[in-house]
From Swiss-Prot:
Record-given protein name: Chaperonin GroEL
Enzyme class: isomerase
Keyword Nucleotide-binding belongs to the record: yes
Compartments where located: Cytoplasm
Residue spans crossing the bilayer: none
Gene Ontology, cellular component aspect: cytoplasm
The keyword Chaperone appears for this protein: yes
InterPro entries: Chaperonin_Cpn60_CS, Cpn60/GroEL, Cpn60/GroEL/TCP-1, GroEL-like_apical_dom_sf, GROEL-like_equatorial_sf, TCP-1-like_intermed_sf
Subunit structure: Forms a cylinder of 14 subunits composed of two heptameric rings stacked back-to-back. Interacts with the co-chaperonin GroES.
Amino acid sequence: MAKEIKFAEDARAAMLRGVDVLADTVKVTLGPKGRNVVLEKSFGSPLITNDGVTIAKEIELEDHFENMGAKLVSEVASKTNDIAGDGTTTATVLTQAIVREGLKNVTAGANPLGIRRGIELATKTAVEELHNISSVVDSKEAIAQVAAVSSGSEKVGQLIADAMEKVGNDGVITIEESKGIETELDVVEGMQFDRGYLSQYMVTDNDKMEAVLENPYILITDKKISNIQDILPLLEQILQQSRPLLIIADDVDGEALPTLVLNKIRGTFNVVAVKAPGFGDRRKAMLEDIAILTGGTVITDDLGLELKDTTIENLGNASKVVVDKDNTTIVEGAGSKEAIDARVHLIKNQIGETTSDFDREKLQERLAKLAGGVAVVKVGAATETELKELKLRIEDALNATRAAVEEGMVSGGGTALVNVIGKVAALEAEGDVATGIKIVVRALEEPIRQIAENAGYEGSVIVDKLKNVDLGIGFNAANGEWVNMVEAGIVDPTKVTRSALQNAASVSALLLTTEAVVADKPEPAAPAPMMDPSMGMGGMM
């Protein structure tokens, strides 16, 4: 296919148009009085949302060059969402501000590489200062504050705080759709580990691409299963019970995997195979954790056990197992409470004895998985459209809360970004590097400016006043008052704010140094076929 190429100013201007289209669409959602965006879906009702990354992913522009600019901003939103789980709209606003100011200076003759160095230096300083002014999130009240700000609902904030209190900060919290109209919290005992199914043909729910096993047997082994004959006697016993099977093994390959998949597809029995979690001695310990949780036995040479001699009595049991491409969650294992408590006590002793930070972290993860359980937030709403929107907000709130627990929190509403301007502006530099620093200083004002404008206030006036008030005081766009942001519960996770700035600066700096853009040349539409003059003319002389 032929290519179309644009250079220098033409290339950057086209990409800026794409950046503006996407950012202008997303930024109307920022802040407590941000609006929603309606997204057309190919089937079903439209999606109404204020989630930045969801909106960004939907935008495709007809012009290839403009679309590349839009996709770069979408990448910023996606990357921020992957790292922190929230802050995608802030990241989009920051990207647009840096790109706009940067391109003005590049067009005026500034050196893009000098500007890039200035942007990187300013961003590094701003991130360091964000960490300096952040505070630790370790109370239920602080967790509820963060979740409430992210979701825009105090009820959701309290719900997530309750969930984290019950399963611990490292516990597993999932979000499901409720059959009723109320949103509620359900906590079930369970364990999750980061291993998914070995074949996508094992899924039972093609929409979610996950396998759900109700009341399954669980085979736990540190051996590799390559020969189906090794487990054939066991499979025949399970077949008589008409129950599904989860296989957790070192690996399942050779003839064994296709044989299991074929029987699954034919409906002979429902089976899912996953690799054992962890490595080396840690893998053995985690398999033992799973065995104790489910009331099973690890089939291992250490105990003199062979796969061909395994019986149903050696298998674990659970009320439900959910497996997707990345994770396996075991819910309500059938292990005895006494055995689980003894295992928890053993792990706690090991945590107290170890001198390695890495080992301590891994032991705490095992403890959380064994004792924490799984919290399920069941989202309810009157309509499907409202349900989808609320579910997205709760997911954002959960991600924001975890980010806050990890790196602390700062004043919300764009206040923290303005608070670090003093340190950034004080950096000593010359020429185009100094210009790059000034670009970031200007961009740091943009989120609060947009929040104010979305709430009906003059952004420039709010920014000027914010620069002259005490640290921690900020503008509450919900009611137009100047308050202590932390006391008012208006806080953002440091990780979210930091990730938004870093990702925005990274992509913007690359875009500013772009000198040529290559895109597919649109093919002309094929001409309509000419009609045969002898057709359709019957009866005429």
